[in-house]
Structure formats: C-alpha cells, structure tokens
Amino acid sequence: RYSCPNVIDNNTMTKKFLHLGLLVFLISCAFACKNKGQLTEASKTDSTQENVAKPNIIYILADDLGYGDLSAYGQQKFTTPNIDKLARQGMLFTEHYSGSTVCAPSRSALLTGMHTGHTFVRGNKEIQPEGQYPIPDNTYTLAEAMKKAGYATGVFGKWGLGYPGSEGDPLNQGFDTFFGYNCQRLGHNYYPRHLWANTDSLVLEENAGTKKGIYAPQLIHEKTLDFIEFNKDNPFFLYVASIIPHAELAAPEEIMEKYRGKFPPEKAYKGVDDGPEYRNGPYESQKETHAAFVSMIHILDNQVGEIMAKLEQLGIADNTIVMFTSDNGPHTEGGADPDYFNSNGPFKGTKRDLYEGGIRVPLIVKWPGHVKPNTRTDHVSAFWDVFPTFAGIANMEVPPSLDGVSFLPTLLGEEKEQ
C-alpha cells in the first residue's frame, strides 16, 4: 500500500486534480461497462445471425425404395402424398444414382464423398455378433465436416458402417447423436430386441420373445423429431437413415387394416418365426406381402410429412434444406414383389444388380427461397456428389480426396455454371 500524505494534505490544487482524475476514471469505467454489455449483446446477435444464415440440412435415406415406388415417379397402385408434396415444393431429379447396389457401400460413398472404387467399404462384410466392418478412423466423413462447420450432427435409423465401439461407430465418425440399429443385419427385423442410443444398448422388453410392443421405425422417428426440437435454435445436420421398406415386410396392425385385401392376388411368405435365429437376421412370415409393403410405404410417407410439419411448427422450415432419396433399387427379399408394383420403374434390375433398376434412385430437394418449386432436372448425379454439394451450402472446405462434384448450381437454377 502506498500513501503520500504530505502531498495530498498540503496541496489543494493537487487534490482537485486527483478528484477530477478519479471522476474521469469512474465515468470511463461506467462507459466501458456499458459498451462491454453492448458488445456482448452485439456478439450474441452476430452469432445468432451467423447461425440463422447457416441452413439446417436434413438428408432422408429410404432403404431399398425403388425408383418407381413413389407416385411422384409414376407409381400407380398407391400414393405417397407427403413425398409428392415435397417434390411440388422443390426439385425432382430423374437421373440420380446411389453409391452402390447394396446398403453399406452405398452409405460409405455418401458419407465419404468417394465412389466405390475409392471409398473403404465396398460390400456388406458382416461382423459377429453384431455390426459390419468399420470405416477407418482416418476417414474424413460428411458428419465430421459438418461438425467442424458448427453444426449439431445426428443420425437416426440404420448405420451399417462399423460395429458398436469400433472406429466406425457413428460417434467416432462425426456424429454427436445416434439412435437406431448399428447393425444392418439386425435391421431386417422391425420389432428388435434392442436398439442403440449413442453407445448404450437399449433393451426393448416390449419385444421380448415373440412380443411386438415397439415398432422400431416409430420409436426412431420420435427420437428424430426430438433432435429437431432440441436443436431448433442452432444449425443442425440430420441424417435420417430409415429402414423402410427394407427386407422384412412388417407393419403395425392398425396400418395393415387399411390395406388388407386391396392388392390381389396376395402372396404369402414363409419365414423364420421361432428358434435361435428368430429376430437375428432372417425375416418373419407374412401372409399379405402386398398389403404389408404398402403399409410400410404409408408409414415412411407419413414420417416425412411429420418431419416437415415439425419444421413449420418450430418456424425453421424456410431455413432448412431437405433431401429425400434411397440407398439402392428395390429388393426381392422377405416376400417383396417389385414386379407387382413396378418398383424399378422402366428400368432393368433390382437391388444387387448393376443395372439402372439397381442404382437409379429418386432424389427430391426442397430449399425455400433457393430451389425453385415444382421443377425437374435430368442432371446426372450420384451419392458421392452430396458431400461437396452440402459443403457448398454450408461454406465448408472440401478435402481433395473427394470424387464428387457439387450439384449446387443445378439446385440454384444455374445449369450453365454446372
């Protein structure tokens, strides 16, 4: 502590200057505090504006949905009103291609931006007791790029790119949140004994034995809506990897009732309904495969509609880009009948076939204020083009390893630049 009693006590002028200096100092502090508060609020505003400027991105991936399985693409036996509405509000692609003819490599191409000649996962290599061969730790995924750009990242549905806890686990590949099937083999069954919530196995007691208490796509959908609600004030990347209408043909009875007897002649399918392999990969029996298939498409279409309604309810629809597509062509397993529904449209081949019917898939994109409503394009694009397209939308750096080419100019109506 320092003091100068003689100076302060003996010099009135000095005292006046000291008092004046103290007054100026206090006033300066007051203004500084006020300005600091204003700068803090301004920073918050700038941060909020920056987040608002970044569009939310939702990528909905159906599983084994054929080019002809939507009424917007020519389906005649049933309708998909919510997905059709999405097409009317956005752009419909007529020449979009999946990453591969089957699940895991198609997803790998999507998330790495590399075609199947370069991306690590090139087949459905199974790991026991659960999961598939993982993508390596040094893989730079779309989710990691999104996270680096300030996005909350979530995947809901089927993963298939690395068994639980592996380097390919979704939480090790850029996703903040995961809920659903880690193993695509177990995704053959719609009433599973467990699902994964991040790194925790969630046992579904309601599905123990032969019970059918929880229809997994519905539970996953509810968690998807929760993710949107939770992140409504921040930019998010949501990857909805639906298992519909993959493999087993199964739907809740209240939905099946709407379609029973409407698609004759019905075809019965005999599957595995008990024993050690029950709900461990093989499909259950289904007496009315046509009605079951349409019921599943009904559920998928409704879920798309509910996602769009949630965006509207939260007031974020205008700042959200939504893409809808499928991972490959229609399948023939579990009693599925693509010939009856003309699921592959005018094309030859189905899932696993390297023909147009096996790899040409729907793609619909809605982005209010950017993508002109009710438009079509014959621009040729594929799954590995999605990464650079999203990079352009979110102002992200694109790694040189990508094979894809952004189709953002096409979305913006700038075909000449494309």
Residue ranges and their predicted role:
Residues 59, 67-154, 164-165, 177, ...:
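Active-site segment of extracytoplasmic enzymes that catalyze sulfate/phosphate-ester chemistry
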